[in-house]
């Protein structure tokens, strides 16, 4: 029975992971590097203990750290020299201690959908309940409502069905280019990257009245599961939905996952465009940019 969730003992999996995330930019000639913003430090929590974290840049430059409005660690790099190659190297070691099969202690008032957030919850969730992409014809909302089973729908089952629906609707394709498709573009094209999966899920959930946020970070895939999961050797994106009692529940629509036993969050955001790992500029000729390479390695 749902209200007995708190009495169920969950099996926790403790694992130590090492992350290396290296981004290399190459230019055809030396350019003046502008300020760069980096979101590369994993978010510490009850389930994630950060042992060490280091970010280095070549050419060397001062790095200052701060926290943004969502509590994400934000590094700003002020380059003072010209260069034809820029290397940003982030390394971290951490312990992840999360239930492989989590049980959520959802408040009695929220077990059945639709439910109402408290006045304080609604105020604090604020913009996280507002869709960020236009849906002028109501196509996305109609798509999302198709997962509602009636006037009395189990809330967690609805969210699981919605996540599965994203995975069934979109074909997964890796995409190195920047940017994210709108939910309508994803529905029209029928394919997308993990970012597109997460955005479609979050926007659909917001349309149904949920508070939702995007999460970016890394995905750990054990060797025996690499053929069954998508998103290895790259940054990853997923979602969190706020449900009273349970708090923020993690959903990975790319892999039809619930819970964060193999997810390492770096940033949470209202809009996926607020959680770009590396953002910056340079001054030089328009054709000076040559290439970008990203290498991500998550090992136990």
Give the residues covered by each predicted segment.
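Structural beta-strand/beta-sheet cores of well-ordered domains, especially the beta-sheet scaffolds
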Residues: 15, 21, 34-36, 53, ...
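Glycine-centered loop/turn motifs
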Residues: 91, 151-152, 228
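Hydrophobic/aromatic-rich core segments of domains that either
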Residues: 164, 196-284
């Amino acid at each position: 029975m749902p209200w007995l969730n708190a009495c169920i003992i969950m099996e926790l999996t403790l694992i130590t992971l090492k992350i290396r995330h290296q981004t290399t930019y190459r230019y055809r000639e030396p350019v003046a590097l502008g300020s760069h913003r980096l979101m590369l430090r994993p978010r510490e929590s009850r389930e994630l203990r950060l042992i060490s974290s280091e970010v280095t840049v070549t050419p060397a430059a001062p790095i200052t750290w701060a926290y943004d409005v969502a509590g994400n660690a934000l590094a700003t790099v002020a380059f003072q020299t010209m260069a034809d190659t820029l290397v940003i190297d982030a390394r971290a070691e951490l312990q992840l201690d999360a239930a492989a099969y989590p049980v959520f202690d959802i408040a009695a008032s929220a077990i059945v959908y639709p439910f109402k957030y408290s006045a304080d919850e609604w105020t604090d969730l604020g913009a996280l309940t507002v869709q960020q992409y236009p849906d002028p014809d109501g196509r996305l909302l109609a798509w999302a409502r198709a997962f509602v089973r009636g006037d009395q729908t189990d809330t967690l089952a609805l969210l699981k069905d919605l996540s599965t629906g994203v995975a069934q609707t979109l074909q997964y394709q890796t995409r190195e280019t920047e940017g994210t498709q709108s939910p309508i573009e994803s529905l029209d094209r029928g394919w997308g990257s993990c970012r597109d999966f997460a955005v479609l899920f979050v926007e659909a959930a917001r349309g149904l009245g949920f508070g939702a946020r995007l999460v970016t970070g890394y995905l750990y895939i054990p060797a025996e599961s690499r053929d069954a999961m998508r998103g290895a050797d790259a940054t990853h994106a997923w979602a969190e939905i706020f449900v009273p009692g349970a708090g923020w529940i993690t959903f990975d629509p790319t892999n039809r996952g619930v819970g964060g036993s193999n997810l390492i969050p770096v940033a949470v955001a209202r809009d996926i465009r607020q959680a770009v790992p590396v953002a910056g500029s340079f001054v030089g000729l328009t054709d000076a940019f040559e290439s970008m390479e990203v290498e991500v390695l998550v090992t136990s």
